[in-house]
Amino acid sequence: MSLETVPKDLRHLRACLLCSLVKTIDQFEYDGCDNCESYLQMKGNREMVYECTSSSFDGVIAMMSPEDSWVAKWQRIGNFKPGVYAVTVTGRLPPGVVRELKSRGVIYRSRDTAVKT
């Protein structure tokens, strides 16, 4: 797991609404999302960071070997990069972002357990 992926602080943590990666707001703005940057383009765009991440999430998983992890398969994060992931994330991506994902062939499954998709 790359040290750039690990949250540098326990304050101001946010989770990506698409893949549930957990980082600080500054890390998302500086590096974007390690898994979703090509779709969400958060790097250098604080407004997109606020729209595409949530500060409300439950549980964290530190995933180091996605190919060997049954937890990664259970959480549907087995194809993602090693890092710290939220178990559930409250919130949904904006409709415009969901439409853009769909047009690029990406299926969006909300990680919000309060909302059925």
UniProtKB/Swiss-Prot annotation:
Keywords: Activator, Metal-binding, Nucleus, Repressor, Transcription, Transcription regulation, Zinc, Zinc-finger
Localization of this protein: Nucleus
Superkingdom as given in the UniProt entry: Eukaryota
GO function terms (MF aspect): RNA polymerase II complex binding; zinc ion binding
Main location: nucleus
InterPro entries on file: RPABC4/Spt4, Spt4, Spt4/RpoE2_Znf, Spt4_sf
Region (Interaction with SUPT5H): 1-40
Zinc finger (C4-type): 16-36
Gene Ontology CC: one annotated term: DSIF complex
Any one biological process term the GO annotation gives: regulation of DNA-templated transcription
Subunit structure: Interacts with SUPT5H to form the DSIF complex. DSIF interacts with RNA polymerase II and with the positive transcription elongation factor b complex (P-TEFb complex), which is composed of CDK9 and cyclin-T.
Protein family (similarity comment): Belongs to the SPT4 family.
Role description: May function as a component of the DRB sensitivity-inducing factor complex (DSIF complex), which regulates transcription elongation by RNA polymerase II. Probably enhances transcriptional pausing at sites proximal to the promoter, which may facilitate the assembly of an elongation competent RNA polymerase II complex. Also acts to stimulate transcriptional elongation at low nucleotide concentrations. Regulation of transcriptional elongation by this protein is required for the expression of genes which control neuronal development.
Protein's name in the database: Transcription elongation factor SPT4
